[in-house]
Amino acid sequence: MMHIKSLPHAHAAATAMSSNCDIVIVAAQPQTTIANNNNNETVTQATHPAHMAAVQQQQQQQQQQQQQHHQQQQQQSSGPPSVPPPPTELPLPFQMHLSGISAEAHSAAQAAAMAAAQAAAAQAAAAEQQQPPPPTSHLTHLTTHSPTTIHSEHYLANGHSEHPGEGNAAVGVGGAVREPEKPFHCTVCDRRFRQLSTLTNHVKIHTGEKPYKCNVCDKTFRQSSTLTNHLKIHTGEKPYNCNFCPKHFRQLSTLANHVKIHTGEKPFECVICKKQFRQSSTLNNHIKIHVMDKVYVPVKIKTEEDEG
């Protein structure tokens, strides 16, 4: 008996051989031949080389996946729990054999597993971002209700400026310029001031407080600037010099008044007699003359009728 693997070989063999020869045509696909010899069963399987290579590759992938799974379990047991990053390749939830399915089906299943893992990682990240913020400290909360803060908010809410002495003069009805407001007033004489520092210095007049003392003559002063100018008397320091004459002065204000002598400037004018002066203090003393002219004492003159 002769085994022929192709149809052309079968026709050639039929013409060459006699009629007593049996011809069997066998397909090209692998077959399994079972033979019994001395009660021992031998199984021979003929497999295509490409199929064997695919099976070996699948087995290697399964071994790698098992090793990765084992390493992940060891890391979870040794370290604190954390959200793992999305894996680049995931084992499928069921066993698949390349001999049973196509490569396209395997790729589709792998892509579905990757999408599910990425969705789980995104949910974990969103849960971490939605955690509540840390609670505000008690001291920070009390600061918002402190008396200074409440007073400042109430002061600004009523139309006052944060820096009363720095604002411009307000414009009233008809374009008339009003005096800048003076929100700080003295509780003793009810005098009002634009700045709190000016009120603080004014109150020292009523209390008699003079905290600044000269170390040379033991003279005391209400303001530190006055003490600074006083010390120049002992040191003989006169840092301000006139550009018109060789005179020197201890205070800048004294120099400014002296320069008006050379320039002839007299900015202070009396509203009654229109006389002008270089200094405001000289004008104030001049106004007292007009006030004293209006002060009189009624004197009754005796007449002859009164005597009779």
Curated annotation (Swiss-Prot):
Compartments reported by the entry: Nucleus
Keywords for the protein's UniProt record, in alphabetical order: DNA-binding, Metal-binding, Nucleus, Repeat, Repressor, Transcription, Transcription regulation, Zinc, Zinc-finger
Chain intervals with Low complexity compositional bias: 56-76
Record InterPro entries: Znf_C2H2_sf, Znf_C2H2_type
Molecular function as annotated in GO: DNA-binding transcription factor activity, RNA polymerase II-specific; RNA polymerase II transcription regulatory region sequence-specific DNA binding; zinc ion binding
Disordered: region residues: 50-94, 123-143
Biased composition (Pro residues): 81-90
Organ and tissue specificity: Found in all tissues examined including the ovary and the fat body.
Alphabetized SUPFAM superfamilies for the sequence: beta-beta-alpha zinc fingers
Main localization of the protein described in the UniProt heading: nucleus
Described purpose of this protein according to its UniProt entry: Transcriptional repressor that binds specifically to fat body-specific enhancers, namely the adult ADH enhancer (AAE) and the enhancer that controls yolk protein gene expression.
The protein's name: Adult enhancer factor 1
Highest classification ranks of the organism: Eukaryota, Metazoa, Ecdysozoa, Arthropoda, Hexapoda
